[in-house]
Each structure stands twice: as C-alpha cells, then as structure tokens.
C-alpha cells in the first residue's frame, strides 16, 4: 500500500484518502511505513522530503487504540491466525514503539481513536502526518446519503458477522443510526449474528442470518451458497413486507 501511495504522489496527488479495514496483516503499519522510507530512529519519511505537502486521510470504521486489550494485536491478531504468544509479543513491541514515538514526536498513539485500525495502519498514517476520520461519515458525505435516507421507507444493509465490533462505527450500525434520525427502520442481513438481541434492537428493526441450515464456515462463505441463501431470505422478506403493505 505504501508503494501505491508513493506512486500516487509521484503522479501528482496532493490528497490521498486511504480506506482502512479488511487487511491481511496485523503488523502495526510497519510494512507501510518501511515502503515510505520511514526512519524508525528519526521519525522522518519520504513525505518529509517532498517540496509540496501531501495530505493523508485515513478512513476507519473502528476506534481501537494502538496497543493493549483493544489494540491491533489483541483484537485483529487472532483473525490473522496469530498464536497467543505471537499476539502477546506483537502487543509488547507495539507498546514499546508507541513509547518511542511519544518521545520522538510527542504523539500519543494510545489516545488517538482508530490508531489500531486495520492492524495498526491507522497509527502509521498518523506518524506520517496524516489524520483519521470516520470512514462511514466520509463515504456518506460523498454519496449525500443523509439526504437520500429522508425519502426511504426501509433500509436493508448487511454484514459478514454482526458482533460487538460492529457497534464501534462499522457501516451497518452507522447507517442504521443515521436512518433512525428520520424514523426509517433498518433490517440487517448477515452471514452470522453474534450480538445479543437487546443490543441489536437498539439500532435495527430486525437482524437475520442468511444461513438456511447448520453449515460449516467453509461452506457458508462459498459464493454460490451465499448468493442462494441471500435470494431465499430476500424473497421471504419481500413477501412479509408486501403482506403488511396491502
């Protein structure tokens, strides 16, 4: 990703917006920093050598800090297959690095919401002089979503797995809360639901898993199976909605 950013800069980009989420790594942004020639001793990078400033904006849907129980290693490490010992070691390295950064730049990564987003890429963007903002809010602004919702009768959204992390700014909950301002109900269709009914009811009219029967994860994420399950659930929902709109 750092190489892509560098290429964009060399082609004349002056503002780069990076969407953070769904990464395949959880390295605290180390690879990203290295590809932009970040010097871990001085805190300087490729961006510091540019004649004209470049604005980096990180769009994130979570507010995790850089390290600790809610940091990138502890929360996202298991998703990447990290063992307990690897996660503990990575979190300790992240903690030490954050202390060094504070000493170098008086930047406290631990107090910046989203610095642990995308395996720590949020923190890396901050170290390069960038800022973090709500990914949903930015996309909603570009799409003029707030205005569009005012003329809706019902919102249907989705999530691979609806869980407690979803309540930390992820799209399904964020759009449900925006729709709620205009008394527009929201239904969520999910691959799996791992949130208590009471918590889900705070934001959604209803939450449904698309699965039709007991199924393995491998089978559940098969594209053909997923499309079939969504079609079946969507058809049943439309029948239900039509019945109440007679």
Where do the protein language model's features map onto the residues?
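N-terminal loops that bind phosphate or other acidic moieties
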Residues: 1-246
């Amino acid at each position: 990703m750092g190489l892509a950013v560098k290429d964009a800069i060399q082609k004349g980009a002056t503002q780069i917006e990076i969407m953070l989420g769904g990464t395949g790594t959880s390295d605290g942004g180390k690879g990203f920093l290295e590809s932009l020639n970040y010097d871990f001793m001085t805190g300087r990078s490729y961006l510091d050598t540019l004649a004209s400033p470049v604005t980096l904006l990180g769009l994130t849907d979570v507010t995790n800090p850089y390290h600790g129980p809610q940091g990138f290693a502890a929360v996202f490490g298991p998703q990447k297959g990290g063992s307990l010992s690897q996660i503990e070691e990575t979190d300790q390295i992240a903690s030490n690095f954050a202390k060094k950064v504070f000493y170098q730049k008086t930047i406290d990564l631990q107090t910046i919401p989203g610095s642990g987003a995308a395996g720590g890429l949020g923190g890396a963007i901050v170290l390069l002089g960038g800022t973090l903002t709500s990914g949903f809010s930015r996309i909603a602004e570009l799409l003029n979503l707030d205005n569009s919702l005012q003329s809706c009768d019902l919102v249907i959204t989705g999530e691979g797995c609806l869980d407690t992390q979803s309540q930390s700014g992820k799209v399904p909950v964020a759009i449900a809360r925006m729709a709620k301002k205009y008394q527009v109900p929201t239904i969520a269709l999910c691959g799996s639901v791992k949130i208590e009914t009471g918590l889900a009811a705070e934001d959604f009219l209803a939450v449904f898993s698309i699965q039709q029967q007991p199924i393995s994860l491998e089978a559940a994420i098969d594209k053909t199976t997923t499309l079939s399950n969504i079609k079946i659930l969507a058809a049943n929902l439309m029948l239900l909605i039509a019945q109440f709109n007679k």
